[in-house]
UniProtKB/Swiss-Prot annotation:
The lineage of its organism: Bacteria, Pseudomonadati, Pseudomonadota, Alphaproteobacteria, Rhodobacterales. Belongs to the UPF0262 family. Pfam families: UPF0262. InterPro entries: UCP032146. NCBIfam families: PRK02853.1. This is UPF0262 protein Pden_1958. It comes from Paracoccus denitrificans (strain Pd 1222). Residues 1-22 are annotated as: Disordered. It comes from the Bacteria.
Amino acid sequence: MSQSANRLCRIDIDDSALPPPSPEIEQDRRVAVFDLLEDNSFTLPGREGQDVPPGPYALALAVREKRLVFDIATESGSKVAEFHLSLGPFRQTVKDYFQICTSYFDAVKRLPPAQIEAIDMARRGIHNEGARTLQERLEGKAEVDIDTARRLFTLICALVPG
């Protein structure tokens, strides 16, 4: 596990207002959280001349008033930052991601490996697009590497209706 202070040490997802996810989506979420906690890069830049308390950080993700909310606290629970991102830039990518995931889950049950691999490559491409969008939207608020962005995008998909 990464022991850097520039990381997430806890992740909470507030999905209380959402219908239960499918078993496949729930599994993706569990894997993303596990992988994030094992290895991630999450840095908060100083803002307006203020120092940022050192990490590691706890992240609470939620959707409130049609905005994606990142609520950041220190490991001990002291609030550090909260920022809201418009869901608009994510909607089409999330929709595309859900559609390709459905195709992938269906393909795994009935198609030959070559066709499954082609669908999986498309799925990864859409996933990467979502991760890059997240990195762009976080600019000036938080810095994450591409692997962290990919895993966070998986969690965002759990919060945004596809």
